[in-house]
């Protein structure tokens, strides 16, 4: 910055900017520093398995449940006993918790940066829209609601609204 500054008796009375150069455009960002603890519900950037169990249906093309026709499966199905706790794959904000047609009882969590996870066919839900959840927090219980042929957790990972193969994100 080049400026013409006028002083009267040692006190600045006028300043006129003659020219300025921006060396680098400012970037809006959140910086974590100091000793303040990070909220537990903030996403960690990695996902965990929502339940332990055997994968009974993979991502992509498959025969429709009931054996008639075919569908493009938007997630994976993980078998589990009725009532088994379902856990959040990462921290975030619950954006849906309720009945959603073929999904049955569904929980949807927004993890930020374009990532959303869905957990379907639950027997019961333990979170509500607007809740902040942490990675590993119980959010539902395994069931067979909606278009389902047995107890399992349907797990989806979506990036910018597009379903992705969850196995590419799980350890």
Would you name each region that the model predicts?
Residues 41-171:
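Catalytic cores of peptidoglycan-degrading enzymes
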Residues 1-60, 81-82:
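Well-ordered beta-sheet/strand-loop patches within structured domains
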């Amino acid at each position: 910055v080049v400026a013409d500054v006028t002083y009267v008796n040692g006190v600045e009375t006028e300043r006129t900017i003659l020219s300025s150069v921006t060396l680098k455009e400012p970037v809006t960002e959140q910086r974590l520093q100091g000793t303040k603890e990070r909220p537990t519900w903030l996403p960690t950037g990695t996902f965990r398995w929502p339940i332990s169990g055997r994968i009974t249906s993979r991502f992509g093309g498959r025969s429709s449940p009931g054996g008639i026709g075919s569908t493009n499966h938007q997630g994976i199905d993980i078998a589990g006993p009725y009532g088994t706790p379902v856990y959040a794959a990462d921290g975030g904000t619950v954006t849906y918790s309720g009945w959603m047609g073929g999904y049955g009882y569904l929980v949807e969590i927004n993890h930020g940066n374009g990532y959303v996870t869905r957990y379907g066919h639950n027997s019961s839900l333990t979170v509500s829209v607007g809740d902040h959840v942490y990675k590993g927090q119980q959010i539902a219980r395994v069931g067979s609601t909606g278009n389902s042929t047995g107890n399992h957790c349907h797990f989806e990972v979506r990036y910018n609204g597009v379903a992705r193969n969850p196995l590419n994100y799980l350890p």
